[in-house]
Swiss-Prot record:
Keywords: Membrane, Mitochondrion, Mitochondrion inner membrane, Phosphoprotein, Sporulation, Transit peptide. This is RNA-binding protein RMD9, mitochondrial. The gene is RMD9. Phosphorylated. Phosphorylation promotes binding to RNA. Residues 1-32 form a transit peptide. Binds the 3'-UTR of mitochondrial mRNAs. Involved in the processing or stability of mitochondrial mRNAs. It is found in: Mitochondrion inner membrane. It is a peripheral membrane protein. Residues 55-68 have a biased composition (Basic and acidic residues). It comes from the Eukaryota. GO terms for cellular component: mitochondrial inner membrane. It comes from Kluyveromyces lactis (strain ATCC 8585 / CBS 2359 / DSM 70799 / NBRC 1267 / NRRL Y-1140 / WM37). Belongs to the RMD9 family.
Length: 664
């Protein structure tokens, strides 16, 4: 069977003329256990004596000689072919381990890419998350095995990168469609998946640069685009520079293709490369293709670079060229959409940017525009930076909110509202009265465009702390009940954190803390998450640190400076002779003053609550972060750390908890 496979392999690759000759008069055979040899008949042996030949025999002999020359040349070809074929490693054999792994990889890639784009009859994406993420993980595991054995070609490696890139987009889409942002202070699936994809892409890029695996131009483009979407701009450039300066010409070729260079052009400009140098690179890369039309991806990169360099006329000229059939044939709609969005968010000429924005709203373009919220946010920021005209900002925000409609996901609306509300409070930071009136008008207007939701109020509650007004914070807190919006744990954290911007008694902070803990227990948390501890920290330690930086007085209370030896000496009467007659009254006044200080000492409150509730930490490592870690990062907390072990916190209230576990 093995010999038959070898023969079939050679027959499919050697010239037909030689195969035919080897079958006929010469009766030749291939020997695969040594160099290819040719067995001749005795009549063909030049050492054998031959009788005298007639003229016809001479002609026949001449033809045979010519045939022998052809055969000899073909024999040499087969020998060369033999040297380049590893007959002991036929990967296409069904019995080969590599064959089964390659098939498994192909199945995973096909299954993953299909799951990421499957749609229902109504056009909506089908939720096949578990199948998709399983395919991503399995593909990466098989990739590692094939890299070790050297059985992975550039096509399959590129498809693995493509799947990783698609996974980033799927992860991002799932995040923006969530009703609330994930708790990044505790563990979340999307956070873990982002880290996993990032590390996987780094592993693949390392394999490419180390010549362990090769990729096509498409794989290189997906790789760099992935790092760029992860906001790892410096790493994106470093990978590209290392690739184009590689000694491996195949790597250089892959990373110099137009659609790859288009990814890095804007980054090169942002990192100091001159516009003229980028134009030269653009022209060089544009010529590096045999396609009849240019690369839309390269042009998109050049347009973004032109906009960043304020070369708006050049950008418009390229866009017009992209839209014409003469210049680029039928351009991919995705690239046209990306170019349109680039003009909205990245063009510093506000007239041009707003023109593209209005065209996107009107939906009368020959290509479909999915108005990305990131582009709208960039436009709003550019308007504010250049004009400081808040009315223009309101106009764009209002139009975008109406465009997205009432059913848009909280992720998209929250992203837009966060940018808008930040600019709002920046505009009214010193004019609280006018700002409060305008804020009420905006809340009413938003309720008419899209019903008031929890994320919208959360954003306002977070940003309004710049006014440092307790009445405003309490008024916004009441709005949740006014609009019949249930408070999630995120809201309780924001409320507690807001206490760090105003002056309130410690009892108020304790009350907000207990409410937060009760909510955490209610939703099934089994330990106090990092985000909960962070809210307490900001309400207490961060507040005190800011007061200290701003010149406020700060000193430890009596309980903070407790000295057992000194207390024992006082109790024994050792210092009675040194007391003045009126010392009793003064001592009482001193104690009252210290008691008031203790009631308002937020750092003391922080460590008391930490010690009382620390048993509900996730693990000792978390407890160390919220005790010694805080003292390490906050100067005002350092004197308190040594007092934690001696604190009596038995009187601090802990509500009944059903789900919390004693972990520490």
């Amino acid at each position: 069977m093995f010999r038959l496979v070898q023969q079939q392999t050679l027959k499919s690759r050697v010239p037909n003329q030689f195969v035919s000759a080897s079958r006929n008069s010469l009766n030749s055979q291939f020997r695969f256990n040594s160099a290819v040899a040719l067995e001749r008949n005795p009549q063909q042996d030049p050492t054998t004596a031959a009788p005298a030949k007639s003229s016809s025999d001479k002609r026949n002999s001449k033809k045979k000689y010519e045939n022998n020359e052809i055969i000899e040349r073909n024999v040499k070809k087969v020998r060369n072919l033999r040297r380049n074929i590893k007959f002991d490693n036929f990967k296409n054999s069904p019995n080969s381990p590599a064959f089964s792994k390659l098939n498994a990889l192909d199945d995973c890639l096909a299954r993953g890419l299909e799951a990421s784009s499957s749609r229902a009859p109504d056009g909506k994406f089908l939720d096949q998350s578990s199948l998709f993420w399983d395919s991503v993980s399995s593909s990466m595991n098989i990739y590692r095995e094939l890299v070790i054995t050297g059985d992975l070609n550039n096509h399959r490696a590129s498809r693995v990168i493509q799947l990783m890139h698609v996974a980033l987009k799927v992860n991002r889409t799932q995040l923006t469609s969530m009703n609330k942002k994930p708790d990044y202070d505790s563990q979340s699936f999307h956070k873990e998946m982002t880290n996993y994809l990032c590390e996987s892409l780094r592993e693949i890029s390392g394999d490419i640069l180390a010549n362990r695996v090769s990729v096509s131009e498409h794989g290189a483009a997906h790789l760099l685009s992935s790092f760029k979407e992860l906001l790892l701009y410096e790493e994106t450039l470093n990978i590209w520079k290392a690739a184009v300066n590689s000694e491996n010409k195949d790597i250089v070729k892959s990373f110099m293709f137009p659609n790859v260079v288009g990814v890095v052009l804007p980054l090169l400009y942002e990192n100091g490369t001159t516009f003229e140098e980028i134009k030269k690179l653009y022209e060089k890369s544009a010529s590096n293709t045999t396609r009849s039309h240019g690369s839309p991806s390269l042009v998109l990169g050049m347009i973004k670079t032109s906009l960043a360099a304020n070369e708006n006329e050049h950008a418009l000229s390229l866009f017009q060229e992209m839209c014409t059939s003469e210049g680029f044939g039928v351009s991919p709609y995705a690239v046209l959409t990306g170019t349109h969005l680039a003009f909205i968010g990245e063009c510093k000429d506000l007239y041009v940017a707003k023109s593209f924005f209005e065209r996107a709203l009107s939906k009368d373009m020959p290509y479909k525009i999915n108005l990305q919220v990131s582009s709208v946010k960039q436009l709003i920021q550019n308007i504010w930076d250049q004009t400081h005209d808040f009315n223009e900002v309101v106009d764009v925000w209002t139009k975008a909110t109406k465009y997205y409609g009432k059913d848009v996901s909280h992720g998209i609306s929250s992203s837009l509202n966060s940018k808008f509300i930040s600019i709002f409070f920046e505009n009214y930071v010193t004019d609280k009265a006018a700002g409060l009136q305008h804020l009420q008008e905006l809340v009413t207007a938003y309720d008419e465009m899209k019903a008031i939701d929890e994320p919208f109020l959360n954003i306002i509650l977070t940003k309004c702390t710049v006014w440092q007004d307790r009445n405003i914070i309490e008024s916004i807190e009441k709005s949740y009940e006014l609009y019949h919006i249930p408070k999630t744990i995120v809201t309780y954290r924001i409320i507690l954190k807001a206490m760090g911007s105003i002056s309130v008694p410690n009892d108020v902070i304790r009350e907000k803390w207990v409410q937060l803990i009760q909510k955490a227990d209610q939703i099934g948390q089994t330990y106090i998450a990092n985000a909960d501890w962070a809210a307490l920290r900001d309400a207490t330690v961060t507040y005190t640190q800011e007061q200290f930086k701003n010149g406020g007085s700060y000193e430890m209370t009596t309980s903070d400076s407790y000295n057992p030896a000194l207390e024992a000496a006082n109790a024994s009467g050792a210092f009675d002779d040194f007391n003045e007659p009126t010392s009793g009254t003064k001592h009482a006044d001193h104690l009252n003053t210290q008691t008031n200080k203790e009631d308002n000492d937020r750092i003391l409150l922080y460590y008391q609550l930490v010690k009382r509730y620390g048993v509900y930490c996730r693990d000792p490592k978390q407890y160390a972060r919220i005790t010694s870690g805080i003292a390490l990062n906050f100067e005002v907390a350092q004197p308190y750390l040594g007092l934690v072990n001696t604190m009596d916190v038995s009187s601090i209230y802990v509500p009944p908890l059903r789900n919390f576990h004693l972990n520490h």
